[in-house]
Amino acid sequence: MFECTHCDLHFESKSKLATHQKTKKCTAHRFLGFTCQKCWDHVKGYENALNHVAKCGQKLQTFEGIQALVAQLALHYKCEVVFDHENGKGQINFQKVFNYTHPSNLQEMREPIEPRSMHVWYKMLRKYSDQYLLGGHGLYLNDINYTLFRLSDAFKFLAAKYDARTLLKMLWIEPTYKLFHVKDGIVYVLGKIQSQTQEGRKWFGDTFCLQRNETIVKCLWYRDPTLEQLWSNTIPLLKEILNLYLDLGTWLLKRKNIKLKNDHKIHHNCKTIIENVFKEYDVTNLIENITVLNSRQTFTTMFREILTQHQKDLRLPSNIHHVFKDDLLPSSLGGQEFSLMTMTEQKISGGNQYHLMYHILPESERPMFETKI
């Protein structure tokens, strides 16, 4: 399910969500909240407000209404109610609570690209500028830790347009804020930041998303000397572009009226056909990016070379306190073995899909894959 956070509504597909968010009811009312004068409940969304008012049968007294209002405040503030029943007076004390709600996990948001949508996707690939794509990507600090993700369709466009070295630099080296640092030959990755308000309140988080009058005062850096922790955290990236490769490859072969037979004797010929089709449509970078992200040695070697070349660009701001920890970069996926065969969102049925998957697998995994089809 896809949620419109402005209207508190859910939709079965991303296309329906996109259609809804273009409607006047959403665009004109997305920054407005509605408070029911019967029950004092706060409602988001124009349609939700109309439905609530029509169905609400409560009629709270003044004190109950105040309690309901406090309950609403408690969602965003730490509240305390002090009431003097003898004198009929009371006081409400509340203090801001600093919570950050991340976007939904990428794995819960993905749906396979339909053939008719694939045509539109490929058309848009050449339309969007790099500035538009990078702005739409909305990089978060979590793009490093990958416990939660903020990866939009813009990432797929970048993975199709650029080779692996350029893609890695665009995502992690060129952004204004620095997520990597090399100290005494050891690679450190930014893991947490401490922010502060003008009043002096401090809290730790993992995002650069700040409100007005809030500043970053401390950065915590974690060791990743071999870059293997970082590599294992890129599995969501790999899974996303692998499925794009299968969707796009199936669509391109069908568009060229190519049907590959389920015969291992013609593997070499099929590989040449697939490579030529991807080359004709100028999307061979997808194949390279999957190959690099799927190889621990290739990825770590390439990324260390990039960090070395851009070490002068990784200087840290002097107005922030930096703490370098001996702990490894946190990773929920560290040390796990994985295979491209377990990352597909669709069942490989044979023919074109079979050969697309076969030729993207490492040599060592191909015999096992043949036994599963």
UniProtKB/Swiss-Prot annotation:
InterPro entries: Znf_C2H2_type (IPR013087)
Zinc finger (C2H2-type): 2-29
Superkingdom in the source lineage: Viruses
Keywords: Metal-binding, Zinc, Zinc-finger
GO MF terms held by the record: zinc ion binding
Homology family: Belongs to the IIV-6 302L family.
Name of the molecule in the record: Putative zinc finger protein 012R
